[in-house]
Amino acid sequence: WDLNAIYSDNELRDVTFGQFDLNRLRQGLGPSFIDASGTPRCGTAAAVLAGCVPVDLFGGPDAFTREMADFTGVTLKDETNKELYDYTANITGDLFELPAGPLGFAAGYEYRREQGYFLPDAITASGATTGSAAQPTNGGFSLDEFYAEFNVPVLKDLAFAQVLEISLAARYSDYSNFG
């Protein structure tokens, strides 16, 4: 016989670089003008977008500056968690002796519960990045499972049958989310 217990808690914090904030990219690529001091500004002379950095995608290989990248770039932070509880009990052995050998038996039970969640960065959830949008999600399920197996020896060491056995097995599974 054996008894087992497993607990697992996996947490992932994913940091993604190299994506752009679409709202800031729109601002940086939107209307712009050169102010009186010769500095490019976002918006119009009548409505300057404070803090915005105009983005130049067509000015040659060095036109996209570090300042532009810092303004439009975003670091995304997602969180994922999965938790598992698993308990099993099993018993095996021979029940009694038959003429062709012992009647083998095995039975067991398992209870398992899994749950988890995913929390994307707020910008990812809003769909305002150049990457794929994703929504927060969570869920879980539990399972109760029973099994029984029998190995029935029928014939042994005969001229026409070295070994003849019948194996019988049954399993019952009850999932909390279906079936």
Describe the role of every protein-language-model region.
Residues W1-D144:
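Surface-exposed, low-complexity loop segments enriched in small/polar and acidic residues
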Residues G93-L95, V152-V154, Y172:
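Residue-level signature of outer-membrane beta-barrel architecture
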Residues F96-G104, L155-L164:
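Short loop/turn motifs that connect adjacent beta-strands in outer-membrane beta-barrel proteins
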Residues G140-D157:
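Structured alpha-helical segments in the cores of large, soluble enzyme domains
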Residues V163-S176:
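Transmembrane beta-strand segments that form the barrel wall of outer-membrane beta-barrel proteins
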